């Protein structure tokens, strides 16, 4: 099985329990990161079809709609035959527009980060 993982290190807030590589969301950083992703794909000549694509983080759902669409456009050459296309989401950064965008870009699996069901602990 051929798999591709794309790390989106941006978060709206930094959680004390998280050990993953992450930084605060800033629009200009996201734009530079997406441009660097394009460069890396071209420079390393990454190609081919993948069985699974997983977009993790950080909090990928913290990106705005235009940034998410740019990310999906960047990854589209690798998702033509994908069986499982996953993105990590935080319920705080989700809305119907993002869900629609995910569906329109063939996301077929969400990984929802639930640390607690107690509001006072969030």
Where on the chain are the PLM-derived regions?
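Short acidic/polar active-site loop segments enriched in Thr and Asp
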Residues: 2, 51, 108
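Canonical Radical SAM [4Fe-4S] cluster-binding loop centered on the CxxxCxxC motif
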Residues: 2-32, 105, 115, 119-122
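Conserved, mostly hydrophobic/aromatic
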Residues: 11, 37, 55, 87, ...
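Conserved glycine-rich "GG(E/T)P / GGGxP" loop and the immediately following alpha-helix
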Residues: 21-27, 46-79, 85, 90-101, ...
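Hydrophobic alpha-helical membrane-association signature
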Residues: 33-37, 71
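A short, N-terminal amphipathic alpha-helix
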Residues: 37-48
């Amino acid at each position: 099985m051929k798999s591709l993982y794309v790390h989106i290190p941006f978060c709206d807030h930094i959680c004390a329990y998280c050990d993953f590589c992450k930084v605060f969301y800033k629009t200009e950083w996201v734009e530079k990161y997406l441009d660097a992703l394009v460069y890396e794909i071209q420079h390393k000549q990454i190609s081919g079809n993948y069985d699974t694509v997983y977009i993790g983080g950080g909090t990928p759902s913290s990106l705005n709609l235009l940034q998410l669409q740019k990310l999906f456009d960047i990854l589209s050459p690798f998702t033509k035959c994908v069986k499982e296309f996953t993105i990590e989401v935080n319920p705080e950064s989700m809305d119907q527009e993002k869900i629609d965008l995910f569906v329109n870009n063939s996301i077929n699996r969400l990984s929802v980060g639930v640390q607690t069901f107690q509001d006072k602990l969030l």
